A protein has these predicted regions:
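Transmembrane alpha-helix boundary and packing residues in multipass membrane permease domains
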Residues: 20, 24, 32, 36, ...
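Transmembrane alpha-helical segments of integral membrane proteins
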Residues: 172-182
Length: 196
């Protein structure tokens, strides 16, 4: 067998990969808009956001692992036409994601001051970080659910629909919140209602 690029597989890779890449890029742009809004509160708020965001990075890895598992097992079962198993995979991943995220999110909130203290000793930085946690740790399980459905669809080879839904659902809502509602209620807590 010769090593060569097979156009049929290359097409499939692009059909799944390009929309996923576009989605990731657009979500990162909306995160930059969120960061810009946080920056308007000054350097202490920026430091609190940066510290809390670093901690959320660890939480997101845990949440995203269920999305990756769902995508992998869905694609395997889709390939062998075991469609009932695909439903079971999605339901199990949803339950596990919600349970793990609620436990980890609660832990992050409970131990938030200690975790934020790793990044800064300043009381105001910790205060801002905890304000962000108070709005985001409770609802972070939604992040897992929002990622699971697109992950399952990608596992079946559909990537454009999840991209459109994520851009409208996550980015669209966040942009409307940041530029439409946030200017009338300028507080860090109100800003983070748009998250995740």
């Amino acid at each position: 067998a010769k090593l060569r690029i097979r156009s049929v597989y290359l097409k499939q890779i692009f059909e799944v990969g390009v929309p996923a890449g576009i989605q990731s890029t657009v979500i990162n742009i909306s995160n930059a808009m969120l960061q810009s809004s946080v920056n308007s509160f000054g350097s202490i708020a920026m430091a609190g956001y940066t510290a809390s965001n670093n901690i959320f990075g660890f939480l997101y890895v845990s949440v995203n692992s269920f999305t990756q598992a769902c995508m992998s097992f869905t694609s395997q079962n889709y390939g062998v036409k075991k469609l009932k198993r695909m439903d079971r995979v999605l339901i199990d991943c949803m339950i596990l994601s919600v349970v793990v995220t609620l436990i980890l999110g609660s832990s992050v909130y409970i131990f938030g001051p200690e975790l934020l203290h790793i990044y800064s000793n300043q009381a105001d930085v910790i205060k801002y970080g905890m304000e962000i946690f108070s709005y985001t740790t409770v609802t972070y399980f939604l992040c897992g659910l929002m990622d699971l459905f697109p992950g399952a669809l990608r596992g079946m080879g559909y990537s454009t629909v999840p991209m459109i839904l994520s851009i409208i659902g996550t980015v669209g809502v966040r942009i409307i919140w940041i530029y439409g509602l946030f200017p009338t209620h300028r507080s860090l807590g109100f800003l983070f209602i748009s998250y995740p």
